[in-house]
């Protein structure tokens, strides 16, 4: 487009039907798990997974998420977010700026300072939106990152699985972290209960 390299994400035909079939199978597995161990209500887990997976089929939503992250991370130079080409994108076609970079694993033999810099950038890309705005990038696999320059920072490439949580959930994360840090079982249990877990036993927590 105007001689500029772009990244194009095109949805496979009939993906919606394939996704619904997989989610139905998952519901059956969760129902079986509830009968074997009712301590964790897997119905809410199934609803959450279903909602996130269905959202990934909506590329307009993903475009909005990419813009949101570009705004959130605008003052974090070690994390780059591709721009969205709205005039070329649709609900099943997403067109983004092409960000030059190399695979994350190609830097695993780099010096310690470089690896620390990359790891810090990855942490900030995940933690800053979550801790400040309760927004989490829910698909942090290696294919969703590349590294630009000589380990100067990361390109964050995929925004299909983004979750905005209520403040209560973030409080649960903080409680869990502090409970584990202090070996405080009561605080750990409270954190899990905040997330909807019930009738917790020590063996489940451990």
Region roles according to the model:
Residues 1-206:
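Conserved catalytic cores of large enzyme domains
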């Amino acid at each position: 487009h105007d001689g500029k390299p772009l990244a194009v994400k095109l949805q496979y035909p009939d993906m919606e039907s394939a996704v619904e079939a997989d989610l139905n199978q998952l519901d059956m597995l969760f129902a079986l798990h509830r009968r074997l161990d009712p301590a964790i209500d897997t119905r809410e887990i199934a609803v959450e997974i279903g909602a996130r997976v269905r959202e990934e089929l909506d590329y307009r939503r993903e475009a909005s998420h990419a813009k949101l992250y570009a705004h959130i991370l605008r003052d974090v130079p070690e994390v780059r977010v591709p721009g969205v080409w709205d005039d070329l994108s649709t609900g099943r076609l997403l067109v983004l700026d092409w960000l030059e970079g190399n695979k994350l694993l190609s830097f695993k033999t780099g010096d310690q300072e470089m690896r620390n810099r990359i790891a810090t950038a990855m942490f900030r890309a995940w933690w800053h939106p979550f801790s400040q705005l309760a927004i989490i990038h829910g698909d942090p696999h290696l294919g969703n990152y590349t590294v630009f320059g000589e380990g100067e920072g990361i390109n964050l490439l995929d925004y299909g699985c983004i979750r905005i949580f209520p403040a209560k959930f973030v409080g649960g994360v903080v409680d869990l972290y502090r409970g584990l840090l202090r070996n405080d079982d009561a605080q750990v249990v409270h954190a899990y209960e905040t997330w909807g877990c019930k009738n917790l036993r020590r063996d489940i927590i451990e």
